[in-house]
């Protein structure tokens, strides 16, 4: 909707103009009804498949190595592996697909209008396929036998309650709530420092595994539990790892949405002292200003002209923003 319409090097003026102005509701509806059959969407699905496969293979490999070779990895090591692989995949694939790797995250994003509903089934299918294939490769590579559902055979890389179902359900809810709350904070809120989103999310996974891993297995992800369950045919208490993460993710996203919602827009809260102009006014800012930025406030659908001096490197450092 918004595009850079003019960059003048002599006066270092930056103008963000609005072409073919439309309401924020119209723009949201167009963004949330993205076509299903497109090269871009196929690329996203491939990204979700690769990211989920890598995450499950690396994380579950750490579990197998720890159980097979005398526990050299330990619980903190396993937690660190999961956190690191998620962080790496976020920075590798986040710009392609959004790096969900988790059906609960995709559903929560869609419920909070941060992701198109019609793309959720495709994302979930790609995530489940990646998880299932990763579990199959793990079983083949490590020669894990069939008698794992009883927990008396070789290592089972799936998840199962080591305590009561109620306790495990609550732990999965809390862990997934924490994860989705952090994801919503660092990945969807412009007030956050987006470049550190991957680190924050990875660190949250490490912490969640440390406190919930010994109790529920710290799934936080229906695909993470479903893939191994399908390969080994272990379905006992599987519902717990589908229902609880989805409820936890929805609750985390909605709770952060309450923090985001205010009577004033985000721009009005932290960006004061700008000269307001009409949404139909094409008036340019004073050429006496060194840096000029024209933006639109989605809440009020009005234009604002903002300006500030350059920084010590001669670059525009716009500190005067919406009001």
From Swiss-Prot:
One of its GO terms (molecular function) is channel activity. A motif (NPA 2) lies at residues 221-223. InterPro entries: Aquaporin-like, Aquaporin_transptr, MIP, MIP_CS. Keywords: Acetylation, Membrane, Repeat, Transmembrane, Transmembrane helix, Transport. One of its GO terms (cellular component) is membrane. Aquaporins facilitate the transport of water and small neutral solutes across cell membranes. This is Aquaporin NIP3-1. It comes from Arabidopsis thaliana. The gene is NIP3-1.
């Amino acid at each position: 909707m918004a595009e850079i319409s003019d960059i003048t090097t002599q006066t270092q003026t930056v103008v963000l103009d609005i072409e073919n102005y439309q309401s924020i509701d119209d723009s949201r509806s167009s963004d949330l009804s993205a076509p299903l059959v497109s090269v871009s969407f196929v690329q996203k699905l491939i990204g979700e498949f690769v990211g989920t496969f890598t995450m499950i293979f690396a994380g579950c490999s750490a579990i197998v190595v720890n159980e097979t070779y005398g526990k050299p990895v330990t619980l903190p090591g396993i937690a660190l592996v999961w956190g690191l692989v998620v962080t790496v995949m976020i920075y590798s694939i986040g710009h392609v697909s959004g790096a969900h790797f988790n059906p609960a995250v995709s559903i929560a994003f869609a419920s909070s209008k941060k992701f198109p509903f019609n793309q959720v089934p495709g994302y979930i299918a790609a995530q489940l396929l990646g998880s299932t294939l990763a579990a199959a490769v793990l079983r083949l590579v490590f020669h894990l036998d069939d008698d794992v559902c009883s927990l008396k055979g070789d290592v089972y890389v799936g998840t199962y309650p080591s305590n009561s179902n109620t306790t495990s359900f609550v732990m999965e809810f809390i862990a997934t709530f924490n994860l989705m709350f952090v994801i919503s904070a660092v990945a969807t809120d412009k007030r956050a420092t987006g470049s550190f989103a991957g680190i924050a999310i990875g660190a949250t996974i490490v912490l969640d595994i440390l406190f919930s891993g010994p109790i529920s297995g710290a799934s936080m992800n229906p695909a993470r539990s479903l893939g191994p369950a399908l390969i080994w045919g272990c379905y006992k208490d599987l519902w717990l790892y589908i229902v609880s993460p989805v409820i936890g993710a929805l609750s985390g996203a909605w709770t952060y949405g309450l923090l985001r919602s205010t009577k004033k827009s985000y721009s009005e809260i932290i960006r004061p002292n700008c000269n307001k102009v009409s949404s139909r006014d094409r008036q340019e800012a004073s050429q006496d200003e060194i840096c000029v930025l024209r933006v639109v406030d989605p809440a009020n659908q009005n234009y604002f002209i903002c300006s500030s001096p350059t920084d010590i490197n001669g670059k525009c450092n716009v500190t005067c923003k919406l009001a």
